[in-house]
Regions:
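N-terminal small/polar loop signature for handling phosphorylated ligands or for N-terminal nucleophile
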Residues: 46-115, 119, 124-125
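Short, high-confidence coil segments that cap the C-terminus of an alpha-helix
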Residues: 30-31, 89
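Conserved beta-strand elements of the Class I
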Residues: 34-35, 91-93, 134
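N-terminal amphipathic/basic leader segments beginning at the initiator methionine
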Residues: 1-29
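Cofactor-binding loop segments of dinucleotide-utilizing enzymes, especially the Rossmann-like FAD-
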Residues: 37-39, 67, 136-138
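A glycine/threonine-rich phosphate-anchoring loop and its flanking beta-alpha core
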Residues: 10, 20, 112-169
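Glycine-rich phosphate/diphosphate-binding loop of Rossmann-like nucleotide-binding domains
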Residues: 24, 34-54
Length: 169
């Protein structure tokens, strides 16, 4: 076996009732979130209602970016960036799987970049800052919650590329 060094600065809170700690994690960074989710399974399972109640009871304001598609689109990322800037969002809260988390990572970097988020593809040196992300992973299929990559799709060029930075863990 070859020697190696492995660094994952991701904090993981897991277990029964762990979701109840969510407001505490959010309040370390601010009192407003962009809640990002996909097709609505979090509503069908009751997770959405539970999270909204936790946010409301903790006086954490929230706006929503719903309908994040598999292979998140650049237009969705841009919409999220605009929402963060217009509403002075402090934390991004993706709830879902890899696509939701990837979209949120791209939003986190894009909201701190003065330009088109697509410019960040292949240019980690351009990512000088990123918004905090506190993810509620509902399925661990892609591992996005444990890596510094965000894969997004540019509908115009038909390209699927990644944005990468240690700031996106």
């Amino acid at each position: 076996m070859e020697n190696f060094f492995y660094n994952i600065p991701t904090k993981v809170s897991f277990g029964k009732g762990a979701i109840d700690d969510l407001p505490g994690y959010i309040s370390e960074y601010g009192d407003s979130v962009l809640l990002v989710y996909g097709g609505g399974s979090i509503k069908r399972t009751g997770l959405y209602d539970r999270i909204i109640k936790l946010l409301d009871c903790s006086h954490i304001s929230h706006i929503e970016l719903s309908g994040v598609e598999p292979n998140p689109r650049l237009t969705t990322v841009k919409k999220g960036v605009q929402m963060c800037l217009e509403h002075d969002v402090k934390v991004i809260l993706p709830v879902g799987g890899g696509s939701t988390i990837d979209c949120s990572k791209a939003i986190a970097a894009g909201a701190c970049y003065d330009g088109d988020p697509w410019d960040l593809v292949g240019h980690p040196e351009k990512i000088e800052n990123a918004m905090p992300i506190i993810a509620v992973a509902t399925m661990a299929a892609t591992g996005s919650e444990m890596d510094p990559f965000a894969v997004i799709t540019n509908e115009e060029t038909k390209q699927k590329k990644d944005i990468a930075s240690d700031l996106l863990y």
